[in-house]
Amino acid sequence: MVKGFHIELTNICTLKCAGCARTQFIDRFPQHWKNHSVNIDDLFNFLDCDLSGKRISLCGHYGDPIYHPDFHRIIRQFKNKGAILYLTTNGSYKTESWWEQTVSILDQKDTVQFSVDGLPENFTNYRVNADWKSIEIGMKVVAKSQCSSEWSYIPFNYNENNIEEARELCKKIGIKEFIVNKSDRWDKYTDHLKPSSSKIGQRYDSQQEWKHTTTISGVDPNCNQGQSHFITADGHYTPCCYSADFRFYYQTPFGKNKQKYSIKYNTISSVLADKTTQDFYNSLENHKVCQFNCPKVEKQ
């Protein structure tokens, strides 16, 4: 059953966030990096299902969706098919007219989420190379539009005491919702930014235990609910963005058989009917990518 899709329109980004798979891949394997933006014709040929009322999450794993060269054409085509769009972006380096064109395509069912972790004077401690001036322009245009708007804020040690100030700034700009998004992605690249324990995501302890023991009490994956079918910027299907991460991708059947899951030569219907895909979904607890990223934890 298909409830929606998570689509990485491009792996292009202007930022260099320490915890990002893009940053870490380029630092470790610069000779292997290539910029990709999903082919529009391939994308919509692959999506051979009814998109009316389905949620399409445009959120980058390696890149920021707003940097796809044909971004407006893509979102217009999704809206023409009745999809509900959820756009997640940092929002840097786009003009007022670009944002006005964006919101003219969206409607009241759609959401634009800005990822800004801190105040204008400190959020670039993590969002390296981001630009507050252009972000604020985008926020103000979106805030005045008919679509929903959100500010997503990850607590770090440099900003965990600024949450209420940021919440007030959010209200002042007119963004409708302020979300504190506690991260569990702490490792040698990001430990220097780790906040106090109360500001860390609830999966963190389970992930650390898994790293040392590879044992879990079960998995609770969103993809099993048909909500996270993922399409990569270079045009391949995986069950979710976690399984597209280079640290797990080539351990999965989707990374081992990339051509088999190319959106250029397949449809979502054929991929989901494939025995290998079905076997993967039927044995999620056996896969390292699921064990690490989606451990079953007590709800807080």
Where are these regions (language model features)?
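Flexible mid-to-C-terminal extensions adjoining Fe-S/redox cofactors in radical SAM and related proteins
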Residues: 1-5, 23, 236-300
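A structural signal for well-ordered alpha-helical scaffolds and beta->alpha junctions
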Residues: 2, 6, 39-43, 71, ...
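Short, small/polar residue-rich loop motifs at catalytic or cofactor-binding pockets
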Residues: 222-226
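Short, P/G- and charge-enriched loop/turn segments at secondary-structure junctions
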Residues: 212-219, 280-282
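Residues immediately within or flanking Cys/His clusters that coordinate Zn2+
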Residues: 10, 14, 220, 287, ...
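Conserved C-terminal portion of the radical SAM core fold
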Residues: 4, 8, 51-59, 79-88, ...
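Conserved alpha-helical substructure of the radical SAM core
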Residues: 1-111, 125-133, 137, 144, ...
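Short, solvent-exposed loop/turn segments at secondary-structure junctions
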Residues: 12-14, 23-27, 63-64, 92-94, ...
